[in-house]
Amino acid sequence: MNLVNFKSALKTLKRGLPIIFTTDTLPAIGCLPKFSEVIYEFKKRDKNKPLILMGSEHKQLIDYVHESAIEDFESIASKYWPGALTMVIPSSEKETEILTSTDNTLGLRIPNSYMAQSLMLLTGPLLTSSANISGFNGATTSEGIALDFPSLSILGPIPWEKSSGKASTIIAWKK
């Protein structure tokens, strides 16, 4: 297992590689937004399936939200984040280069996880997905994930904080 600390995780991300880390729901694979292709490659994921942009606090994500949805975004974020809720919301026109969907929306989330929030305070928002090979149930422990992704760095310390083991609830913004 390639266990890394926060400083090494940041170096890995800046080199364009994804890392594995825990969240409040399922373990995540994440990368800096400009390197989104690597998640699709490692997961063997269909490129038509969007990724989720995670941050440490909603202020990190607000620039990614279209102006027509900011009021609703703020209201929902203040009520349900941090937590196991992913908001699919119209994306800002200035941030379209990170879009992984075809309908100009972006999934946004702030996990209720000290480790994940601490990581993203350091790195900024990360594009993420659950840490599994697409189409297969993923492991929920660092040891199991290391078997699926032996070449990827896993953020420590181990054992990870307790998570729910269930995917986040997804809500879509409608005008």
What is each of the regions a protein language model found here?
Residues 1-175:
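Active-site-adjacent structural elements in enzyme catalytic cores
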